[in-house]
């Protein structure tokens, strides 16, 4: 079973403490009834994506290729697009962000965006949702506070 030690992990349906993860999309859930409710909404289109992502443990031979891919990405020219470790920590400690992430609708939007094929189109659609815009603004306010004040 996947580790559910994250302090912010809650059941995607009822927001209780989860015990399990959906084998398709990996969202946490706490019981069979919650899984059944989630399963109705869990997209069958997401299954191939998750199967590609779900791989053997990090110790396998394939992970060595993944490690070099990550290293290549980290050494890419897109340094200005990267969030600093301190800002990542600030995101993780934000109570406002945590409370937004408890919303099942926002979680489903993020899962759809993560698993979708046309991310640019999905991002445009998500940015039409006031809840997602509030989430994005909260993240940007934490990561780029000086730009938020200037606007």
Curated annotation (Swiss-Prot):
Pfam families: zf-HIT, ZNHIT3_C
Binding site for Zn(2+) 1: 11, 14, 30, 34
Biased composition (Basic and acidic residues): 43-53
Binding site residues for Zn(2+) 2: 22, 25, 38, 42
Keywords from the named record: Cytoplasm, Metal-binding, Nucleus, Phosphoprotein, Zinc, Zinc-finger
Tissue expression: Expressed in the cerebellum.
Cellular component, GO annotation: cytoplasm; nucleus
MF-aspect GO terms: zinc ion binding
SUPFAM superfamilies: HIT/MYND zinc finger-like
Zinc finger (HIT-type): 11-42
Phosphoserine modified-residue sites: 76
Coiled coil: none
UniProt-annotated location(s): Cytoplasm; Nucleus
Compositionally skewed regions (Acidic residues) per UniProt: 63-81
InterPro entries noted in UniProt: BCD1 (IPR051639), Znf_HIT (IPR007529), ZNHIT3_C (IPR048371)
Region spans: Disordered: 43-81
Domain of life: Eukaryota
The protein's assembly and partners: Thyroid receptor interacting proteins (TRIPs) specifically interact with the ligand binding domain of the thyroid receptor (TR). Requires the presence of thyroid hormone for its interaction. Interacts with NUFIP1. Interacts (via HIT-type zinc finger) with the RUVBL1/RUVBL2 complex in the presence of ADP.
Protein name per its UniProtKB record: Zinc finger HIT domain-containing protein 3
Source organism of this protein record: Mus musculus (Mouse)
């Amino acid at each position: 079973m996947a580790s559910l030690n994250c302090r912010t992990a809650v059941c995607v349906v009822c927001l209780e403490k989860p015990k399990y993860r959906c084998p398709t999309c990996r969202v946490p859930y706490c019981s069979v009834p919650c899984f059944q409710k989630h399963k109705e909404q869990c997209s069958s289109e997401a299954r191939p994506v998750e199967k590609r992502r779900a791989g053997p443990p990090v110790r396998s031979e394939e992970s060595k290729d993944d490690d070099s891919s990550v290293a290549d990405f980290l050494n890419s020219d897109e340094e200005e697009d990267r969030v600093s470790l301190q800002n990542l920590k600030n995101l993780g400690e934000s109570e406002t962000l945590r409370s937004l992430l408890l919303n099942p609708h926002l979680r489903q939007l993020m899962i759809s965006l993560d698993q979708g094929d046309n991310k640019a189109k999905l991002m445009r659609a998500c940015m039409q949702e006031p809840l997602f815009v509030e989430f994005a603004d909260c993240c940007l306010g934490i990561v780029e506070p000086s730009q938020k004040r200037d606007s």
